[in-house]
């Protein structure tokens, strides 16, 4: 069968675990401070949603109402070493006077946590392999217990290195949101030139990815040229412009879009009922920056 599959992708290998403090800025957006990289991440266990979904029956409908509890993701992180960033900044441990040891306090700290998963995909058009990352962000993550470990005595068979397992939970953040909605977790996929720019930015200074973070090399929508028109009849508000429902992107792909027409005062207008004047059409698609096109409507002569 000849089917149009997407590009093939695989993800492998964790790296660059970053913890940071997050507060709400004066503009209402997240502000991050005290970025630290945590060394030794081995794996991240399944972050399972513990919230229950309940259906409430009424009349002859079994799901008259459906309610889901608040999202609570629980899982674990495994480390092959526990350094200062993990002990002090996540587990809230107290350093000893001589600087050589740490003791638990039970005062676990809530952090914004981000880590990367390396990825590779084969472009379905060119067949080329493209490297990238899946960026995983937990805006509001808290340990729920001290890190556990298991050690064994060395023998002729050798011994495995000790690994520390840290139980964690993630909840929705009042500050970090996507489209105005609070999220307990978010994942980004970045490829090619954007991935290179991401790595360059990260190497110049640790940062947390956000929904409005702009990276160089992004694939963008190509704004169309909309022909100017006249009204259907003289003196009436019955102008109709040609508004495409698909656009090309900067890579030549075809993208389905939605559009909104606004007049010179920013008021939404209805196609087919356009008065003489200048209009701006805004095109939107998931995963792309909006683009606009101008068009004018003149009165029928």
UniProtKB/Swiss-Prot annotation:
**Any Pfam family hit:** L_lac_phage_MSP
> What's the family?
Belongs to the skunalikevirus tail tube protein family.
* Localization terms from the record: Virion
In its UniProt record, which GO terms are filed under biological process? symbiont genome ejection through host cell envelope, long flexible tail mechanism
Q: What does this protein do?
A: Forms the cylindrical rigid tail tube with a 4 nm wide central channel for DNA ejection. The tube is composed of 31 hexameric rings.
Originating organism: Lactococcus phage p2
- What's in the keyword line of the UniProt record? Viral genome ejection through host cell envelope, Viral long flexible tail ejection system, Viral penetration into host cytoplasm, Viral tail protein, Viral tail tube protein, Virion, Virus entry into host cell
What's the entry's take on its domains? The C-terminus probably makes protruding decorations on the whole length of the tail tube.
- Using the UniProt record, give the first listed, main subcellular location: virion
Segments forming a coiled coil: none
Oligomer and partners: Homohexamer. Interacts with the tail terminator protein.
Please provide, in alphabetical order, the Gene Ontology terms of the cellular component aspect for this entry: virus tail, tube
Under what name is this protein listed?
A: Tail tube protein
Q: Which InterPro entries match?
A: L_lac_phage_MSP, L_lac_phage_MSP_N, Phage_tube_C
């Amino acid at each position: 069968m000849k089917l149009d599959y997407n590009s093939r992708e695989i993800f492998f290998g964790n790296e660059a675990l970053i913890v940071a403090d997050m507060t709400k800025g004066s503009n209402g957006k997240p502000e991050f401070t005290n970025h630290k990289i945590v060394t030794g991440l081995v794996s991240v266990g399944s972050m399972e949603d513990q919230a229950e979904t309940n259906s409430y029956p009424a009349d002859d409908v079994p799901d008259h109402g459906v309610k889901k509890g608040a999202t609570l993701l629980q899982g674990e992180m495994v480390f092959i070493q526990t350094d200062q960033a993990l002990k002090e900044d996540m587990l809230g441990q107290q350093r000893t006077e001589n600087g050589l040891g740490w003791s638990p306090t039970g005062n676990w700290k809530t952090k914004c946590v981000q880590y990367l998963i390396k990825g590779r995909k084969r472009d379905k058009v060119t067949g080329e392999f493209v490297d990238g990352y899946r960026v995983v962000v937990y805006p509001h993550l808290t340990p729920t217990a001290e890190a556990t470990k298991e050690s064994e005595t060395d023998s002729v068979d050798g011994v495995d290195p000790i690994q520390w397992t840290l139980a964690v939970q993630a909840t929705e953040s009042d500050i970090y949101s996507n489209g105005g909605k609070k999220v307990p977790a978010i994942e980004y996929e970045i490829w090619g030139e954007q991935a290179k720019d991401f790595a360059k930015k990260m190497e110049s200074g640790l940062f947390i990815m956000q929904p409005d973070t702009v990276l160089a090399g992004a694939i963008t929508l190509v704004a169309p040229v909309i022909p100017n028109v006249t009204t259907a009849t003289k003196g009436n508000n019955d102008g109709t412009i040609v508004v495409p429902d698909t656009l090309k992107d900067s890579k030549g792909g075809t993208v389905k879009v939605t559009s909104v027409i606004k007049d010179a005062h920013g008021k939404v207008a209805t196609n087919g009922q356009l008065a003489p004047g200048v209009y701006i059409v805004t095109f939107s698609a998931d995963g792309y920056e909006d683009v606009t096109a101008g068009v004018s409507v003149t009165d029928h002569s």
